[in-house]
Amino acid sequence: MKQYLEIESVFAREILDSRGNPTVEVEVIAEGGFVGRAAVPSGASTGAFEAVELRDNDKNRYLGKGVQKAVENVNNIIAPEVEGMNVFDQAAVDNLMISLDGTPNKSKLGANAILGVSLATAKAAAEALGLSLYQYIGGVNAKTLPVPMMNIINGGKHADNSVNIQEFMIMPVGASSFRHALQMCAEVFHNLKKVLKDKGYSTAVGDEGGFAPNLKTDEEAIQVILEAVEKAGYKPGDDFRLAIDAASTEMYQEDGTYLFWKSGVKKTKEEMINYWEELVNKYPIISLEDGVAEEDWEGWKMLTERLGKRIQLVGDDLFVTNTTRLKKGIELGVANSILIKVNQIGTLTETLDAIEMANRAGYTAVVSHRSGETEDATIADIAVATNAGQIKTGAPSRTDRVAKYNQLLRIEEEIGAVSRYPGLDAWFNLKKK
């Protein structure tokens, strides 16, 4: 096996994401003609501490959302430096780009420029070795398929409806394999469509493929989902658990309160935590993401003390896939899980570092898409490569979401008999009920 293979060319172009906005796609070609291609995702509700996505801000073009500057940064600044490097030395390529940028949040070259090159490099390396991407990144022990966390009702910033909470998700914990898990979720999704239709609600889908009906209350979202689970022939609690992404940073006010802006309800942090506890007591919820705001460390501590042994408390805006933020969280004892979004940090190396740091501290890791996606399915491979055990990549509708699930089906098939679907064991750090 040749351990040194030169990167011959690096090229970026502007393509469109699932929302019709431009994004960056990069091709890395290694000696021998091995090509790696990667497209970069983009978020709607973004954490303040995320790496910077470079946009052109030219209002005459794509309403200011063009990414020609990021593309030029790849073609004119990054490419000349990376060409000639060893395609197998992922850390060296990533570290070189971090140095070239020189800012703490990748704001000079753009995380979208850097990430495209980073992921395409790994793909070219895998191609050169004749390996699947998950095998190249994860090695021989990459065999755990993730439990999907499927967003089937959208609210908050992801939908123009009456629902304050951003995402209501189902998790098929009782499935026997990933293939079975996907089937279960699709059946619930179709039953939910019927439940909503029968109640006179809209069944149009949002950015992530979930429904976005004008429900009477946030709690009604949970109720219609549980009805759909039962209609599909499954048992809430045994076959399915629920997950919520509150995106609370979007609700956080300067006076330290939380405003459910669509319903006009205001809550103190104590009331907010009581609210989550009431829902957890009432429904089979296993995961709560961003239950309080990214800078409300005191609120996070209270939430973790109250619910941290019972359910997964995921930090998304809180940690932004950043080891510095995660280290602070671990030291303060807040949350027990990290959401992993490659474009929040901007390189594959730093993404893998964050997952490793989380696991060492007894935190789970949930590999996640963004609301603006493409047909690129890299995150499916990352989830298996790291044995993360959970993936969050939307509803079983819209090709930009389904592309990831279909890739996981292929991976499960390729791994064969030794593949493992963890079910409830994905939550190794919780008291099992």
From Swiss-Prot:
It catalyses: (2R)-2-phosphoglycerate = phosphoenolpyruvate + H2O. Keywords: Cytoplasm, Glycolysis, Lyase, Magnesium, Metal-binding, Secreted. Its main location: cytoplasm. Its EC number is 4.2.1.11. Pathway: Carbohydrate degradation; glycolysis; pyruvate from D-glyceraldehyde 3-phosphate: step 4/5. The active site is at E208 (proton donor), K341 (proton acceptor). GO terms for cellular component: cell surface; extracellular region; phosphopyruvate hydratase complex. Its cofactor is Mg(2+). PROSITE patterns: ENOLASE. It is an enzyme of class 4 (lyase). It is found in: Cytoplasm; Secreted; Cell surface. Mg(2+) binds at D245, E289, D316. Binds a second Mg(2+) ion via substrate during catalysis. (2R)-2-phosphoglycerate binds at Q166, K341, R370, S371, K392. Signal peptide: none annotated. Catalyzes the reversible conversion of 2-phosphoglycerate (2-PG) into phosphoenolpyruvate (PEP). It is essential for the degradation of carbohydrates via glycolysis. This is Enolase. It comes from Acetivibrio thermocellus (strain ATCC 27405 / DSM 1237 / JCM 9322 / NBRC 103400 / NCIMB 10682 / NRRL B-4536 / VPI 7372).
